[in-house]
Amino acid sequence: MFWGATGFRETTMTVRAILDTKGHNILSVPLEAKLSAAVKLLAERKIGAVLVMNSGRIEGILSERDIVRVLGERGASVLDEAVSTVMTRKVVSCKQSDTVAAIMEMMTLGKFRHLPVVEGERVVGLISIGDVVKWRVQEYEHEQEALREYIKTA
């Protein structure tokens, strides 16, 4: 165990373990989808981002932050435009074999909250900062329980 550059404790827990728990569901919209339809999807599913896909490939990611930014800059008329005009095009992704600590560091340094999980050319999941925080809380709860048991038997 060691500390990463952002101060996160490095462990061997991988992205695969989170996906195995939360599932591999991937919500996406096509490039030509209207921003208003994507906003509706985010609201209905209570999620913060959706992948923008074309023929099975990631073309971008659309987050709540992207939407708020463009609404502030250009007003409500942007809701009639295609998501391709608003999405983030430079998508950072991870692999299932990446450690949770490594993706925490990626998210912190990159200042983003969602990370597509890609194996080869195939998208296999989407990890959010909420997923990571949930895992970290569970990890600490397990550690505390193990310490309590150790103290009882000492």
Place the predicted regions along the sequence by residue.
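Tandem CBS (Cystathionine beta-synthase) repeat/Bateman regulatory domains
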Residues: 1-154
